[in-house]
Each structure stands twice: as structure tokens, then as C-alpha cells.
């Protein structure tokens, strides 16, 4: 269930918030939406969620048109805005039951589903607590439960980790990865690029309402792309490998013809496209007799790319 966007445009007055945007987001993956304030990210998400009409262009969300099929899109999409926005006097359970009813869920099925979602986001102890006493991070978790109440096939998340503590952010990453592996299409916007880097399969860079051209060294993420619609950019992350014997590590990297960069302590850095490639490299090193001490991705690749792109556009 993918997302396809073609020549999408939306004006506010004379100012284009989104301008002739082409984009294709594959199903069963987590795709990040990255850009500065005012780039059009939230406007795009609102149009995808059938909450804002475009001025021109076409959108398909799970094969549905948000303009002509808004109710069907609302059933297929789980929408989590960056602000909670709900009735503070209602309890967490009552809020989820209200949204379940709005989605047409049977009352007998809605209550156990609501309790299941509260448990999923670790708010089961707050089931009877009014929303007004929740912290910002707890409200974010409740917002995620609300977006998931009707088991959507597409998730649209605007700053989902805002206000969350480190444990909650780690839980969010794990949950989104599990949902994607089950086939859910996830598109999320965030300014916390270090967090996004840990969970996304691909990235769409936006600036001035449109998608930015591919940065050097980045490739298209796997998955079908619509005609003329660029796919998200695949994360080509840099990993660091360290071994007990730096010489043997270097020999293995040379014999395997890997494009590595050696560090002063004998560790090496090398580009890794995905987890499967990382597993293959680790297995190859161990099979070659390299006693690997550590092998992990370096953070900051996404932020460096974002800053470089913004620097070029200025």
C-alpha cells in the first residue's frame, strides 16, 4: 500500500506551500520527510490524510484519492499531528473509544482494542486518567495509540517523538519497525534527525515545497515508484568496525576490495546500504579470521546531508 504524488501544488494566498511535488513512498517501509520549517511537510501530510485539498496535482494513498474518496482514506490512514488536540476532560480510554466509534468500529470490539493500544504505548496504567494530566510525551504516545486504533494500512506521523523521553523514543522506533515489517506504509516528519536516522528505510528531502534532488552517494530506496515520481532516497550509512588485530582487519578489507577509511586506532569505516549488507560483511570478516570487537553504524549521516543540501540551496 504505497503513496503516490504527482505535480502536487497547494497555495496559501499567493504563497505556494507545496509546489509541483512528485513523490513515491513504498509500502511496508518507514520513510522520513526531512526539511526546514516552512518546507511544506505538514501541508503535504494534511493533503495525504484528506484533511486539506490540493489546488492541483494528483494523490493516491493506498490506491485511494483523498480528494474524491476522503472517507475511505480516513479509514485507511492513521494520522498523528504534532499537537495532541483532544478533549482534556475525557480519559485515555474514552478518547480512544471516541475515535474508534468515529471509524465505525463495533463497540464490543472497540474496548479491547483500546486497551490493547494503551498497552502497546505503555499507558495501560493511565487508562482511567483524564488527558489533561498527561505530560507532553504521554500525550504523544496516546496520539499514536489513537492513530492506530482502527489498524490502518498507512501511518502519517508529524513529529511523533516530540516530548518523548529516551525510553519512549526507543519504543517508538521498535514499534514503527515492527509495523513496517508487517506491511504498514509509514511516512513521518521529524526535526530530530538522529532519531529518524535510526528508524527509516528511506528519506524524502523537501525545501520550498518540493522534493530536493538526490545528494551524491545516495540511491533510490527499494520499492515500486509511480511514473515520473522519484522514490525516497536510501540511507547509505557509514559503519565502523574494530578488531583485536588491526592488521588482519585491514588485510581482510583489502582482499574483499571494500572502500574503507582507516582510523588511527586501526578501526575502519565503510559504507553500508542496509542491515542485510551489514550482516554479510560481519559474517565475512569473522569467516576470514578477523576477531571483531565492535561493528556499528555512525550517527549524523542524515543531519550532515540535510545541512549540505540546505547550504547548496542558499
List the predicted regions and their residue ranges.
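Helix-to-loop junction immediately C-terminal to a conserved catalytic motif
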Residues: 49
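Conserved catalytic motifs of ABC-family nucleotide-binding domains
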Residues: 151
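Conserved ABC ATPase "signature" region
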Residues: 97, 101, 108-126
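Catalytic Walker B motif of ABC-type/P-loop ATPase nucleotide-binding domains
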Residues: 155-159
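Conserved ABC ATPase signature
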Residues: 130-134
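Conserved ABC transporter NBD signature motif
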Residues: 57-65, 72-73
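Short, charged/small-residue-rich alpha-helical element at the C-terminal edge
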Residues: 223-229, 234-309
Amino acid at each position: 500500500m504505497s503513496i503516490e504524488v504527482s505535480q502536487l501544488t497547494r497555495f496559501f494566498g499567493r504563497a505556494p506551500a507545496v509546489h509541483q511535488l512528485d513523490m513515491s513512498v513504498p509500502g511496508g517501509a518507514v520513510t522520513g520527510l526531512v526539511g526546514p520549517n516552512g518546507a511544506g511537510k505538514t501541508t503535504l501530510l494534511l493533503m495525504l490524510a484528506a484533511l486539506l485539498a490540493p489546488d492541483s496535482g494528483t494523490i493516491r494513498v493506498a490506491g485511494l484519492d483523498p480528494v474524491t474518496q476522503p472517507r475511505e482514506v480516513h479509514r485507511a490512514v492513521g494520522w498523528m499531528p504534532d499537537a495532541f488536540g483532544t478533549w482534556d476532560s475525557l480519559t485515555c480510554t474514552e478518547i480512544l473509544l471516541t475515535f474508534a466509534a468515529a471509524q465505525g468500529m463495533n463497540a464490543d470490539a472497540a474496548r479491547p482494542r483500546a486497551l490493547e493500544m494503551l498497552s502497546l504505548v505503555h499507558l495501560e496504567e493511565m487508562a482511567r486518567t483524564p488527558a489533561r494530566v498527561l505530560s507532553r510525551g504521554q500525550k504523544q504516545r496516546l496520539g499514536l495509540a489513537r492513530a492506530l486504533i482502527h489498524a490502518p494500512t498507512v501511518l502519517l506521523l508529524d513529529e511523533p517523538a516530540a516530548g518523548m523521553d529516551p525510553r519512549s523514543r526507543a519504543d517508538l522506533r521498535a514499534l514503527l519497525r515492527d509495523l513496517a515489517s508487517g506491511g504498514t506504509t509509514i511516512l513521518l516528519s521529524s526535526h530530530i534527525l538522529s532519531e529518524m536516522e535510526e528508524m527509516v528505510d528511506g528519506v524524502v528531502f523537501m525545501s520550498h515545497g518540493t522534493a530536493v534532488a538526490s545528494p551524491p552517494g545516495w540511491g533510490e530506496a527499494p520499492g515500486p515508484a509511480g511514473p515520473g515520481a522519484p522514490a525516497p532516497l536510501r540511507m547509505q550509512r557509514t559503519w565502523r568496525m574494530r578488531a583485536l588485530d588491526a592488521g588482519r582487519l585491514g588485510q581482510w578489507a583489502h582482499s574483499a576490495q571494500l572502500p574503507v577509511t582507516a582510523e588511527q586506532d586501526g578501526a575502519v569505516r565503510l559504507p553500508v546500504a542496509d542491515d542485510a549488507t551489514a550482516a554479510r560483511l560481519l559474517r565475512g570478516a569473522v569467516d576470514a579470521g578477523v576477531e571483531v570487537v565492535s561493528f556499528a553504524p555512525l550517527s549524523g549521516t542524515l543531519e550532515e546531508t540535510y545541512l549540505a543540501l540546505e547550504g547548496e540551496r542558499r
